[in-house]
Amino acid sequence: MTETADLWPQLLGQLLERQSLSEAQAEQLMNGWLHNQVPDVVSGAILAALQAKGVSASELAGMARVLQRASLGSPLDLPLLVDTCGTGGDGAGTFNISTAVAFVVSAAGIPVVKHGNRSASGKVGSADVLEALGVNLSAEPEQVRAAVAEVGITFLFAPHWHPAMRAVIPYRRALKVRTVFNLLGPLVNPLYPNRQVIGVYAPELVPVMAEALRLLGRERAVVLHSREGLDEAGLDQPTDLGILSGGLVRTEVLNPRDYDLTPAPVQALQGGNLAENAAILAQVLQGSGAPAQRDVVALNAALALQVAGAVPDWGSGIAQAREILASGAAWDRLQKLVNFLAS
């Protein structure tokens, strides 16, 4: 007990020296949090020190591994499984772009396990908007898993799948600032997708998150941050990418002006309240909505389609995503998910 009690101040001291924790140390720390072994005052100091130093890939990977193991899920026996969950928190108030992308990718015949939550920032989260459109967030875990085979997509409402994380809620509420927990959500999908597209709220997180995905054993992934400040690829400025493929991470820049896309500022992508965001999502998935709304979904879907191996390049992905949106197939997927989880 004394040895464990001594560990937490040691980790704090290491972080205050601006030295990152190893994966093993990060695992120890997360286990300590989940089992209420770390004193509150030390926990707050550790979270602040992590944030001030800048979270590392080893810290993210170690913590995520523990949280994923502690979830109620287990790997699905599928060779290809995609998630499009981002960090959120960019403050831009866009409509639910990555949620729309999930249904486009599913309509392309790729199994999708969308992991998400309600918004923590007063905006509209993926869970909020899908619930407004009829998705049952309280479906039994077995039914949520079965939807992947039956519908081609499912939605995992994070709080139902991560009961162990209740232990850290008090720290997050008390601090009221960003912490490492804002980054862990996309890394801990309980159904273990092997391919991911993750938007992050700050450019410096792109290589860090991509390396964390490599350490966690993902096959292919793209981490992105638009220079407009979005955790999505935007239509006005280039987007910085961290691409994981073949066990290596490389950086690349995606310029929307290289493609036949509607140039549009962030303001053209903004949502509103819950009803407004639900209406935009429904319109876009049915092939209507504003051109900029459709194009930003097509662009981001292209990244996911390429990660999934469904298209050879982003241009082909944009074209396929546009066809899917125009056909209403993505809306059909949503309706099938609503009906399946309601039964």
Swiss-Prot record:
Pathway: Amino-acid biosynthesis; L-tryptophan biosynthesis; L-tryptophan from chorismate: step 2/5. GO terms for biological process: L-tryptophan biosynthetic process. InterPro entries: Anthranilate_Pribosyl_Tfrase, Glycosyl_Trfase_fam3, Glycosyl_Trfase_fam3_N_dom, Glycosyl_Trfase_fam3_N_dom_sf, Nuc_phospho_transferase. It is an enzyme of class 2 (transferase). Gene3D superfamilies: Nucleoside phosphorylase/phosphoribosyltransferase catalytic domain (3.40.1030.10), Transferase, Pyrimidine Nucleoside Phosphorylase, Chain C (1.20.970.10). GO terms for molecular function: anthranilate phosphoribosyltransferase activity; magnesium ion binding. Binds 2 magnesium ions per monomer. 5-phospho-alpha-D-ribose 1-diphosphate binds at residues 86, 89-90, 94, 96-99, 114-122, 126. Mg(2+) 2 binds at D231, E232. Anthranilate 1 binds at G86, N117. Its EC number is 2.4.2.18. Keywords: Amino-acid biosynthesis, Aromatic amino acid biosynthesis, Glycosyltransferase, Magnesium, Metal-binding, Transferase, Tryptophan biosynthesis. One of its GO terms (cellular component) is cytosol. Mg(2+) 1 binds at S98, E232. Its cofactor is Mg(2+). Belongs to the anthranilate phosphoribosyltransferase family. Homodimer. Catalyzes the transfer of the phosphoribosyl group of 5-phosphorylribose-1-pyrophosphate (PRPP) to anthranilate to yield N-(5'-phosphoribosyl)-anthranilate (PRA). This is Anthranilate phosphoribosyltransferase. The lineage of its organism: Bacteria, Bacillati, Cyanobacteriota, Cyanophyceae, Synechococcales.
